[in-house]
């Protein structure tokens, strides 16, 4: 059994119904969290199967092996060996998620055979070529998005199965990498949830004196900018036109990202990759 974690340390509890027919998946770029080791031990006592992806030779690795679970060492690049990894660091998500995709494919919970994983890798390579630092802003969607968000509060609206998690990931990356706040919601609920926000003090036309602001001495006021992430609509049904109308009716600029056609995981990969690049460019620009 594991010792008690220090006061204030994060702890996780299994739901009361978890038992021998359940599978616990643990993913972390750290592996030293006492709470996760305790969670693996709790799962073992409940009869749950435990699978974890984390750095090798960590307390979590030992706990999972002690629980007779499956431990998969997290893949890292050579330059990442010394630097601490954060959950939103570029590349960390896929190093943690890819083993789970393969495992869940084998268990039948989703479809991600080797050819799908190869397509995901190809899509990520393609985005890296389009969004890399050597590509000029005018043809680089990530640099363009970062420039548009430089002095804005990102209001992230998502539509579609893949866009939802990509939007939440983008908000997390903005906060963790560049220290920037944002709000995120799914369409069509976002239209009602954020309507007042777009008409309040964050609206583009909220400060009439901004026209006379000293551009050198006074920092720009923070205004909202809608970022619309969406999958290709099925059957032509989409709330995107209403979203554009709402934003424009409040003089709020809007940025849109729509992935190329493909499977759900491929489109998810593209949206995450582009927004990850944008978050990194914002972090570099702000010196975070």
What is each PLM-predicted segment?
Residues 26, 153-159, 225-229:
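Short hydrophobic beta-strand segments
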Residues 47-50, 153, 225, 253:
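Residues at the starts of beta-strands that form the adenosine-phosphate
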């Amino acid at each position: 059994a594991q010792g008690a974690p220090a006061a204030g340390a994060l702890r996780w509890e299994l739901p009361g119904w978890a038992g021998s027919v359940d599978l616990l998946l643990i993913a972390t770029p750290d592996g030293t969290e006492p709470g996760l080791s305790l969670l693996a031990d709790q799962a073992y006592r409940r009869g749950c199967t435990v699978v974890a992806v984390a750095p090798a030779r960590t307390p979590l690795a030992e706990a999972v092996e002690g629980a007779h679970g499956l431990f998969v060492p997290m893949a890292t690049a050579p330059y990442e060996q010394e630097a601490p990894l954060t959950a939103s660091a570029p590349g960390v998500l896929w190093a943690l998620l890819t083993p789970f995709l393969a495992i869940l494919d084998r268990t039948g919970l989703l479809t991600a055979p080797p050819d799908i994983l190869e397509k995901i890798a190809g899509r990520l390579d393609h985005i890296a070529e389009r969004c890399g630092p050597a590509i000029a802003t005018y043809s680089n969607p990530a640099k363009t998005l970062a420039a548009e968000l430089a002095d804005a509060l990102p209001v992230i609206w998502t539509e579609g199965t893949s866009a939802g998690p990509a939007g939440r990931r983008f908000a997390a990356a903005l906060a963790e990498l560049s220290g920037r706040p944002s709000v995120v919601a799914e369409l069509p609920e976002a239209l009602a949830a954020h309507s007042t926000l777009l008409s309040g003090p964050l609206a583009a036309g909220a400060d009439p004196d901004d026209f006379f602001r000293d551009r050198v001495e006074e920092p720009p006021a923070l205004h909202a900018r809608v970022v619309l992430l969406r999958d290709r609509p099925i059957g032509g049904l989409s709330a995107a036109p209403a979203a554009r109308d709402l934003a424009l009716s409040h003089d709020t600029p809007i940025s849109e990202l729509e992935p190329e056609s493909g499977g759900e995981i491929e489109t998810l990969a593209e949206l995450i990759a582009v927004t990850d690049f944008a978050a990194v460019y914002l972090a570099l620009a702000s010196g975070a």
